[in-house]
Amino acid sequence: TEADLTLALSFPVLAGTGIVAALLYRNKVRITITDAVLTVWMLYYAGRVYAGGEYCCATVFLKTVSVYLLYVFLRVVFSHSCISAWWIKAGLVFFGCYEGLLGISQMINGTSRHHLYLLTGTFQNPGPYSACLMMAFVICAFTLSVCSGEGIRWRKPPFFPEVFSGIGKFVRLEYVLTVAMLPVVIVLPATWSRAAFVSIAVVMLLALRRNYWKYRYAVWTSVAVMSASLYFLKQGSADGRLMIWHASLASWWSEVWLGVGTGGFCNAVAEGMAVLHGDGMDLSGAGVTDYAYNILLKILVEQGLVGLGLALMAGGSALLVLRKSSTTLFYALLSLVVFSMFSYPFESLPYRIVAVMIVAWSEARMGIKVSETGRISAVAVLIVMALVSCQLSSVIRLRHEADKDYDMIRGLNDEAFVKDYYELLPLESDNAGFLFDFGKLLRSNARYNDSNAMLRRGALCSADPMFHVLMGNNYRDMGHCNLAEQSYEKAFAIMPNRLYPLYQLMLMYRDNGNVKKARIMAERVLALKPKIESPATKEMKGIAKEIMHDKRGSRKPLIE
């Protein structure tokens, strides 16, 4: 995206800032336990991508490298600066307050960025949007709980120190934080984000643990009531996520130590769904997913126990150090981590930047030293990283341009665009939407084998059963009915609450004159209750009724 490209272009500036700071100040850069574990984890991740190669994962890999480079640059910059935690906390509170005010405006004016949701802030979904409100609330609430009624203690900056000193005498911390909390408190419940509510509850229980024993019965009663309420609030969504987790673990079980491979989570879910369906599990509430809704589960499935162990060591070390550096930021980051156990905040660039910035600041301030490096070594590392970032930005720019070119030709089925799709393929090889559209284009021009080649690649980076349905259509048109039947059955096993795969299989049997199998399939179509009723499902059931009543479904179906 444009934001990823902007971040990559900022790396040389950060590297230059770090180099200047290292040359001007004689401070040595401490290498901490967290630094070491993160570096080992990054090396394992890169090695797993290089040696594995099960899935196309260039986009995910580039984003991960960007996060690691950002951490390295900020670690060096913060090591030579004396930035107070107040600046970070103030920035997060300001961000949350702004998003809260924007949410209020969207509720009043109906200007949400997504037509399905009442409010989304600057995000596309109220889920990630609620995370910034949650962090601002945690910072304000915890600071108010320990505030002693003193005025804000401004650090006198070099510009207008008298002005800032005067403000600190009259503006009280409680007033500022209370005003900042108002839009957050108003908007946060309107997001209906269960992940945010659970995260706030966990942080509150941890912060107030000293009073736990006295109020333990009330606490556990409240936890039980809250858990049941949040589950039944959106039971369908909760059941769907449980199915996603169960299916992904079913696939991971065959690759326990190293995982299925980077970028393979969605395919793991699809394959796991097929396995669970074969075992007779009810998957009527399942849906297509692009996210894991649990960051640790995604790491476990893609990187195995080795990757999860490194992630837990890095995260645990970072949180322990942060707790000593700033208790308020510790609770804020902890709330985001808990939030990521039920949602996907780290799929959004702002939260990756926030997490990296907090950890880099904390490690520079109070990280546990395992070694240290001098100015020359630090400058050398920064120069190497700057060169890597330049190459990274050029690759991201190429992929960003490819995304824009794809947007221009998306949905156009003229044969003249086949060449354009092939030119974009090396840069869009992990884009499921691109591969699906390319497969449709090739199919519309009767290039069935080429179409199936693209659809197979797309199925590796998506959990959508439509890839298998289109492959079945291609096999059917080529006369390979057995392969078509396998593709349709695989599509239904991945998502057994959809009529379309069974409907296509029923039509194939009817067109081939296999009346017996067509009626059997028509019975399955009529007996199945789809997850979402629509005019399309009614049309499919209408064709099935005609076949069942020996009318052979002679009229041409509206849905192909």
Task: Annotate each language-model stretch with its function.
Residues 1-50, 55-94, 143-176, 208-218, ...:
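Transmembrane signal-anchor hairpin modules in multi-pass inner-membrane enzymes, especially those
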Residues 10-21, 42-50, 59-76, 83-115, ...:
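Alpha-helical transmembrane segments of multi-pass inner-membrane proteins
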Residues 113-116, 263-302:
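Interfacial juxtamembrane loops and adjacent helix segments
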Residues 118-119, 196, 200-204, 220-253, ...:
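Flexible juxtamembrane loops connecting transmembrane helices in multi-pass membrane enzymes
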Residues 426, 456-460, 489-493, 527:
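Conserved structural position within tetratricopeptide repeats
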Residues 429-430, 462-463, 496, 530:
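Short coil turns that delineate tetratricopeptide repeat
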